[in-house]
Amino acid sequence: MVPKLFTSQICLLLLLGLLAVEGSLHVKPPQFTWAQWFETQHINMTSQQCTNAMQVINNYQRRCKNQNTFLLTTFANVVNVCGNPNMTCPSNKTRKNCHQSGSQVPLIHCNLTTPSPQNISNCRYAQTPANMFYIVACDNRDQRRDPPQYPVVPVHLDRII
């Protein structure tokens, strides 16, 4: 009885730990709105090389992000996708605020190859260019902090297909 209870408690702790890690992956820095954080992570590729471009994101999160996709398009173009028909979000079936792009866009997918937990500036990434459709989640803008020209804005890159 005791070993089963102990094993169950360990499994529960591991599960809670995994949920905490997963939840922390979707935390935005407090100085950003969700739309601003989307633009920083997925539109503003500050360098042609993933290793350099990811340093910006990693510095905000204080960790090496495992992967990231940069859409080589404008924020305004992604905002326009928010006007496409609503669909269920593939990554979260309870969310109905996703929209699929009507055409493929060039993108660069960055994948962490060399983690460096002690010094995030040493994280290294491989990059894969592609042309793909994408699905974004969109929400109403933050009325106090987002520009008024876009009432609905992208807040999450849900999937590339």
From Swiss-Prot:
Q: Which UniProt keywords apply?
A: Disulfide bond, Endonuclease, Glycoprotein, Hydrolase, Lyase, Lysosome, Nitration, Nuclease, Signal
Name of the protein: Non-secretory ribonuclease
Question: What GO molecular function annotations does the UniProt record carry, in alphabetical order?
Answer: lyase activity; nucleic acid binding; ribonuclease A activity; RNA nuclease activity
Name of the gene this protein is made from = RNASE2
What exactly does this protein do?
Answer: This is a non-secretory ribonuclease. It is a pyrimidine specific nuclease with a slight preference for U. Cytotoxin and helminthotoxin. Possesses a wide variety of biological activities.
From what organism does this protein derive?
Pan troglodytes (Chimpanzee)
Where is this protein found?
Lysosome; Cytoplasmic granule
Q: Which residues carry this modification: 3'-nitrotyrosine?
A: 60
**At which positions is substrate bound?**
65-69
Quaternary structure and interacting proteins, as annotated: Interacts with and forms a tight 1:1 complex with RNH1. Dimerization of two such complexes may occur.
Q: What is its main location?
A: other
Signal sequence annotation: 1-27
Query: What is the main EC category here?
Result: lyase
- EC number(s): the record gives 4.6.1.18
Q: Which cysteines are joined by disulfide bonds?
A: 50-110, 64-123, 82-138, 89-98
Glycosylation, residue list: 34, 44, 86, 92, 111, 119
Active site as annotated: 42 (proton acceptor), 156 (proton donor)
Q: Name one GO biological process term.
A: defense response to virus
User: Would the keyword Lyase turn up in this protein's UniProt record?
Assistant: yes
Q: Does the keyword Cell inner membrane apply?
A: no
Cellular component terms per the entry's GO annotation:
extracellular space; lysosome
- Catalysed reactions, semicolon-separated: an [RNA] containing cytidine + H2O = an [RNA]-3'-cytidine-3'-phosphate + a 5'-hydroxy-ribonucleotide-3'-[RNA]; an [RNA] containing uridine + H2O = an [RNA]-3'-uridine-3'-phosphate + a 5'-hydroxy-ribonucleotide-3'-[RNA]
Q: What domain of life?
A: Eukaryota
The taxonomic lineage of its organism, from the top, reads: Eukaryota, Metazoa, Chordata, Craniata, Vertebrata
Annotated family: Belongs to the pancreatic ribonuclease family.
